[in-house]
Amino acid sequence: MENKKINLDKGYVLVYDFGDVKVHNYNTADYIDDQVILLEKNGKIAVIESPAFYDNNKELEKYIESLGVKLDGVLLSYHMGGGTFLKDSKKYATKKADEYGHIGGGKVLVDNFTKAFGESFDNNIHHVTDYINGGTITLADIKMNIIPTGDAFDIEIPEINFIYTHMLGSDCHSIIAGVDYANAMIDILKGYIEKNYNLILTSHYIPEDIKAVDTKIAYIETLLNIASTCNSKDEMIEKVKEEYPNYSGVNYLEMTAGFFFGE
């Protein structure tokens, strides 16, 4: 569906041109499959999420500069790490997302990634300059609906009928934080189907169409069934890997199993 692919030194950008609005999806090609979304309209740009590695920060800043557009700000939801990226620009987040990134689960992940990846990982936490609430915000002349979630927020972009959420991935494991989380996620994904979004943007996978939502619902339901037959984290991991041998993101599966079995 993308109109153009632009290869950079490390990552690449998929550009989707909808006339008035362009979506630039930056695939960092980093160790954790980070994606960063740029929304462009009327010579302005808004950024959704941040890269997490120093080399990606520089690469994406250079790409944004090459577009010759005015930066309206950065929306930070699930990814508060990478704090040196666009350091002097406006940073928008809900208070819940800010807490998630500074003292909650997001900070735990940053600490873990720092241990795993060392000095290449930018473990600085972004400073939020402007707090937002659920409702609407307009950046780069694009109206966006802010949808609060358990940890942070999703972003609906009605003008192009897109939604941004943390994770999807039709052939990738997801972080599912227990039974209640799984059931809530199924309800959210069914809502996506009802709204029939053109594309689902995420911070860990290239943009996908609505068919990927059906696939993910089936995955979560299977995950719940498998978990109900297991007695340990390791048993769950092995059974899910047997069911989905070609799925990437085994580290996410390991985290999921840890949530299900309290490890």
Each model region followed by its residue ranges:
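Short, amphipathic C-terminal "tail helix"
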Residues: G249-E263
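Conserved beta-strand hairpin/beta-sheet module of binuclear metal-dependent hydrolase folds
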Residues: N7-Y63, F153-M167
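Active-site metal-binding motif and surrounding structural segment of the metallo-beta-lactamase
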Residues: G43-K44, F53-A97, N196
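Short loop/helix-cap segments at secondary-structure boundaries that form the rim of catalytic
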Residues: V15-D17, G82-S89, H102-I103, I137-T138
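Divalent-metal (often Zn2+) His-rich catalytic cores of metallo-beta-lactamase-fold enzymes
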Residues: A182-K239, P245-N246
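Metallo-beta-lactamase
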Residues: I6-K10, A97-A152
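Active-site-proximal loop/helix segments of hydrolase catalytic cores
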Residues: I142-N196
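Active-site environment of divalent metal-dependent phosphoester hydrolases
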Residues: D33, Y54-N56, L76-T84, D98-G101, ...
